Amino acid sequence: MKHSVHFGAGNIGRGFIGEILFKNGFHIDFVDVNNQIIHALNEKGKYEIEIAQKGQSRIEVTNVAGINSKEHPEQVIEAIQRTDIITTAIGPNILPFIAELLAKGIEARRVAGNTQALDVMACKNMIGGSQFLYQEVKKYLSPEGLTFADNYIGFPNAAVDRIVPAQSHEDSLFVVVEPFNEWVVETKRLKNPDLRLKDVHYEEDLEPFIERKLFSVNSGHATSAYIGAHYGAKTILEALQNPNIKSRIESVLAEIRSLLIAKWNFDKKELENYHKVIIERFENPFIVDEVSRVARTPIRKLGYNERFIRPIRELKELSLSYKNLLKTVGYAFDYRDVNDEESIRLGELLAKQSVKDVVIQVTGLDDQELIDQIVEYI
């Protein structure tokens, strides 16, 4: 049986990446620091995924195990030494923390003489995520390890898309996911091109697909949350049931479409259909997706290269409309949740400093015209 090592045994890891790896005939070693999840994986050796649609069918994922990377790093290194593929489903801010362990695993492959090509895919929505991870891993590699990695270890970037809402079940491994999923991998950085996963798309140039996903799904989802919160909606479905909110989301996606078509020459009709499907996904009645989950960490989401400011900057450069995105940014600055540290911090910043200074600090913008435009909506 083929072997995989997957970092991050959370809902996305189990409910999306784990399902695909299982369907491709892999044994999966989940690596995490959550003892409860790791213990359950080792005790049961399987878990269930429920598809959030009519009939609510279930998939049983078997041939799984767990390794606590904090308590048993040597087991992770051993698993990396013999694995056929490595994937991650952890946040960009966590990637540097697994770099040293990955480097030790790569060194172990070198020492063991394992020259089977291996690809490492960071499956979180970050432009250049796998390459970012590689830069972190390189810090811990010996000169011999660097040469070995350059020859045998690939870090192809990936784009992933599946809505997995926050959830809690008696069975800690059980996870509910939406029917839709998309996983795209760039081919130009693959070291093992013969290992092709079914239900995964492979593209020479990944950037158009990452931007299509980030600017459409992530921007649209966050728009639903921030406007929804303003109007008192508790879930994304509730927000979409308000015709006014739905219309505003569609207006934001129309601006995103104009950017994607101008920048990447996407087919207009295909992109319209893609955005129609996104709205339908947000309206899934079998998913309870809390506004608070989607809206959390507004400071991060208002960043210079994030889902709002980046498309706004690029639309402005192209002299295309971004008025509806600006309105959404205003709602994001106004968002408050007592359980979200960033939203509270944002409120504190706005109370102590001028709105303009806070906009500059949070967005990283130096375009005075654009800064002033954002200030008008806060």
UniProtKB/Swiss-Prot annotation:
Its EC number is 1.1.1.17. GO terms for molecular function: mannitol-1-phosphate 5-dehydrogenase activity. It is an enzyme of class 1 (oxidoreductase). InterPro entries: 6-PGluconate_DH-like_C_sf (IPR008927), 6PGD_dom2 (IPR013328), Mannitol_1_phos_5_DH (IPR023028), Mannitol_DH (IPR000669), Mannitol_DH_C (IPR013118), Mannitol_DH_CS (IPR023027), Mannitol_DH_N (IPR013131), NAD(P)-bd_dom_sf (IPR036291). SUPFAM superfamilies: 6-phosphogluconate dehydrogenase C-terminal domain-like (SSF48179), NAD(P)-binding Rossmann-fold domains (SSF51735). Keywords: NAD, Oxidoreductase. One of its GO terms (cellular component) is cytosol. Coiled coil: none annotated. It catalyses: D-mannitol 1-phosphate + NAD(+) = beta-D-fructose 6-phosphate + NADH + H(+). PROSITE patterns: MANNITOL_DHGENASE. It holds the Pfam family Mannitol_dh_C. NAD(+) binds at residues 4-15. GO terms for biological process: mannitol catabolic process. NCBIfam families: PRK02318.1-3, PRK02318.2-5. Belongs to the mannitol dehydrogenase family. This is Mannitol-1-phosphate 5-dehydrogenase. It comes from Streptococcus pneumoniae (strain 70585).
